Amino acid sequence: MLLQFLLLSLCVSVATAKVITGVFNSFDSLTWTRAGNYAYKGPNRPTWNAVLGWSLDGTSANPGDTFTLNMPCVFKFITDQTSVDLTAEGVKYATCQFYSGEEFTTFSSLKCTVSNTLTSSIKALGTVTLPISFNVGGTGSSVDLESSQCFKAGTNTVTFNDGDKKISIDVDFEKTNEDASGYFIASRLIPSINKVSITYVAPQCANGYTSGAMGFIVLTGDTTIDCSNVHVGITKGLNDWNFPVSSDSLSYNKTCSSTGISITYENVPAGYRPFFDVYTSVSGQNRQLRYTNDYACVGSSLQSKPFNLRLRGYNNSEANSNGFVIVATTRTVTDSTTAVTTLPFNPSVDKTKTIEILQPIPTTTITTSYVGVTTSYSTKTAPIGETATVIVDVPYHTTTTVTSEWTGTITTTTTRTNPTDSIDTVVVQVPSPNPTVTTTEYWSQSYATTTTVTAPPGGTDSVIIREPPNPTVTTTEYWSQSYATTLTITAPPGGTNSVIIRVHSSTNDESSESTFSTLSVPSFSGSISVVSIISRPHYVNSTVTHLPSSSSKPVDIPSSDAVTSTNDNSLTSLTGSENGKTSVAISTTFCDDENGCQTSIPQGSVVRTTATTTATTTTIIGDNNGSGKSKSGELSPTGSVTTNTATPNVPSTKVPSNPGAPGTGVPPPLAPSTETQTTNNVPGSPNIPATGTTDIIRESTTVSHTVTGNGNTGVPMNPNPALTTGTSLTGATNSATNPSHETGVNTGSGGSTNIVTPPSSATATVVIPGTDNGATTKGQDTAGGNSNGSTATTNTQGGNNEPGNQPGTNTTGEPVGTTGTQSVELISQQTTLSQQTTSSLISTPLASTFDGSGSIVQHSGWLYVLLTAISIFF
C-alpha cells in the first residue's frame, strides 16, 4: 500500500513539473584569474570567473520545476565539480548540473532543478560563481571554426540567456603575443574525454606553397596519438589568437602511428596556410614532442626548421586523471538543444567512463494549412544520420462576404473573425448607388458608342448612347388640300426615318377621258372649233367616236372647209359637216415626257363632235410632209396629226381659229415654230359640200396611251406595242382608184394623206400607229382580222353600186374589202395598265365637251342656241 502511494506521488510530481525561465536575472561580474603560466589574458586562458544573480519565487516556481542557463562560446567549466547548488542562508533551493560544450557544442550550459525546500511562501535570491574558459577556436571541427568568430581582441560583450531572459556584461580580452607569421602550436585539454587536442599551423608563405611537410614525434612522456581523429586542411586566415577561421581541403599524404604523425603537401595557393589537428592521450605532466617544419614558398627554396616543445598543463580543480579510458558517444534526441552527460560509473567495477552527447536530430519543418481553428504539430522521426520532419498544420479561415449599402460616401470593409468556427465574415458597406440618366443621341460616325459618366456618391450618373443616323425614306403623296406639308417620322435607333411630303393634287394631273352624248338633230351647216390649253399630263388620251347613220346621201365638202393641224404640242382644228347620220368625235391629249410631264408646260386638248354622211375621219402619224417613217416606241420629231371631218354649218362660237393670236385670249402653242399642213381632197373625188343635215347617234371608243417621245411633237405613241411597225401610216398622193371596192387607206408608202369619200356609204376609218404591216384590213372582225389593227373600215349603208359612190385610193392595187352589214366595228387593242384600251357604249342624250384636265364642261348657253337653230333647219 505504501509503495502504491509513493508511486502515485511520484507520478503527480512528474506530471506537475514545468519549465520556468528568468531565474538567472543578472550578470554581476566576469574576472580573469591566471591558472597557468600564460603570458596574456586571452579568452581561452583559464580561469574566467562569472558571477551571476538568481532568484526563486515560490508563488511561480514549484519543486521539480527546471530552468537552464545557456552560455554561448564557453568551452568548459574549470572545476572538478559536476554541479553547483543555489543556496541562501545555507538552504539549498536548486541544484545545477555542469554541461561543458568543449569541442562538441558551441556553448556550455547549466541545468537546474528546484528543490523541495521552496514553498509558495518563500522567495529566495542570491549569486553563483562559475569558473569557465571561452572557446575561440583551435581545431578544424565545425564547432571550433564557428567559435573562432565569437570574439576579437579588445572589448567584447558576453551574453548568457535563461530562456527569454538575457544577461550580459562587457569584458576586455587581450590578443596573443605570438608571431602570426611563424609556425603556431596549441594544445588544449578536454576533461570530459581526458584527451589533449594538438593543433599545428605551418609558417606563412604570402605567395603560396610549392611543397612542405609537418608533423611531430613523441620524445618523452606517456603520449599516444589517436590516428582516427586527424584533420588536415588549409585556412584562409587566423583570428586574433592564431586559430584557423576556415578549413578547405587540399591534396596531402598522411603517415600516422601512435608515436608520430607526418603530413606532406604541395601547391597551396596564395593566401592560404596548411594546418592539421589530432587527439592525443596524455598522462603525467612531462611531455616532450619534436616537430617537423619543412616548407618551400613559391619562388623560394625549401626551408627545414624543426623544433622541440614541452607541453605543460594547468591546475584543474579536479582532473579526474585516474588513467581510465574515457569514451564519448553521441545520441540523437528530440530536444531542441544539445547536452553532454556522464553515464553512471563505478571505478571498482566499470573500466570505461562514458560521456554521452545528447544531440538533437536535424529536422526540417513543413508548414501546411487547413480550414480550421487550432494549430497542430506532428513529427516524423528518422534514424541517426538522417533528417526528421516536423509538420506544422496552421489553420486558416474561409470568409463569406456580406455587402450592404449605407449613406456614407466611401466603401468600408470589416472582417469579423470567428473564434470558434473556420468561417469569418467580411462586411462590405458601399455607398448607395447614384440614379442614372440615359441619353440617346445621334452623331456623324457610322458606329454606336456608350459613355458612362460616374458622379460622386450622392450625384447622378449619366449614360450617353451615341447612335449613327438612321436612313431616311422620302415619300411624296397627293392630297386634296391646297397647301403642301412635310411630316418627318423619326424611328428609334436602327430603324428608318420617314419623310412624307403631301402636295396639292390638281385635277389637271388626271387623264381626260369620257364619252359624248348622242342627239338626233336636223341638217345644218356650221363649224365648231374648241381649243384649250392645259398643263401637260404624263399620258395620252385619244377618243374616237363613230356611229352608223340612219340614212345617207352624198355631200360635198368644199376644199376651203378642210381641217388643218399644226406640228406643235396643241391640236387646233375641228370641222363639222352635214347630210348624214354618222357622228365622229375625237379627243386627243398629248404629253411630251422627255423632261417629265410638268404642269408648267401647257398642252392641248380637243373635243370634236361631227355630223357627216359620207366623210372619212383619219388620224395619221407622220412627219410634216407625210413621207417619214415612224419607229416602234418613238415619235417623229416633226410629226403632226391631221384630222379631216365634214361638219354642218353651225353658228360660229367665235372660237379663234388661230390659237395664240394676239387678243384671242388663247395661249400660244409650246413649239417655237408652227408648220400647217392642209389636207386636200383625193383627186377624182367630188367636193364635199359644207352644209348638210344629220341625226347624231353616239357610240364611243376610248384609247389611252403613255407617251415616251423624244421631241416636242405632241404626237401620241403607239397605244399597243404589239401593233408596232416601222412603216409610216400614210397614203400615196398618186394612188389608183378602185371603183368596185370600198375605199381604205394604204399605209405602205409615204406621202400626204387625203380624205377619201365613197359614193354612198358612211365610213369611219382610224389608222392606229405602229402596226405590223402596211396592209389594209377588212372592217369585218374575223379571226386574225383587226387584232393587228392597221385600218378598220365600216360600211354602214348602201354598196359600191349606189349613185354617187367615188372610187377610193389604193396604192398597192389590191382590193381593200367591204362589209355589207349595218354594224359598226370598234377597234380596241388591250394593253398594259400604262397602255390601257377601253371600249364603252354610251347613249346618254347629253351634249358635252371636255377641257384639258378631263372635266366635262356643260355648254348650256350655246347648246340652247344650237338646238334652236337645228329646229329651224329641221
Swiss-Prot record:
Gene3D superfamilies the record matches: 2.60.40.1280, Agglutinin-like protein, N-terminal domain, N2 subdomain
Ranges of Low complexity composition bias in the record: 548-577, 618-630, 723-746, 783-814
Outcome of swapping residue 820 to D: In allele ALS2-2
Signal sequence interval, chain numbering: 1-17
Sequence ranges of Polar residues compositional bias: 635-656, 673-715, 755-764
Propeptide, residue positions: 852-874
Subcellular location: Cell membrane; Secreted, Cell wall
Ranges for the ALS repeats: 364-395, 400-431, 437-468, 473-501
Keyword Secreted set for record: yes
Result of changing residue 530 to I: In allele ALS2-2
Major location category of this protein: membrane
Post-translational modification: N-glycosylated and O-glycosylated. The GPI-anchor is attached to the protein in the endoplasmic reticulum and serves to target the protein to the cell surface. There, the glucosamine-inositol phospholipid moiety is cleaved off and the GPI-modified mannoprotein is covalently attached via its lipidless GPI glycan remnant to the 1,6-beta-glucan of the outer cell wall layer.
SUPFAM superfamilies: Bacterial adhesins
Residues covalently joined to lipid (GPI-anchor amidated aspartate): 851
Positions of glycan attachment: 253, 315, 541, 625, 788, 810
Region of interest (Disordered), ranges: 545-579, 618-819
Disulfide bonds: 73-150, 96-112, 205-297, 227-256
Keywords: Cell adhesion, Cell membrane, Cell wall, Disulfide bond, Glycoprotein, GPI-anchor, Lipoprotein, Membrane, Repeat, Secreted, Signal, Virulence
Any one annotated GO CC term: side of membrane
Membrane-related topology note: Lipid-anchor; GPI-anchor
GO process terms (BP): cell adhesion involved in multi-species biofilm formation; cell adhesion involved in single-species biofilm formation; cell-cell adhesion; hyphal growth; single-species biofilm formation on inanimate substrate
Superkingdom per UniProt: Eukaryota
Residue ranges of coiled coil: none
Annotated family: Belongs to the ALS family.
Written domain comment of the UniProt record: Each ALS protein has a similar three-domain structure, including a N-ter domain of 433-436 amino acids that is 55-90 percent identical across the family and which mediates adherence to various materials; a central domain of variable numbers of tandemly repeated copies of a 36 amino acid motif; and a C-ter; domain that is relatively variable in length and sequence across the family.
Protein name: Agglutinin-like protein 2
Native source species: Candida albicans (Yeast)
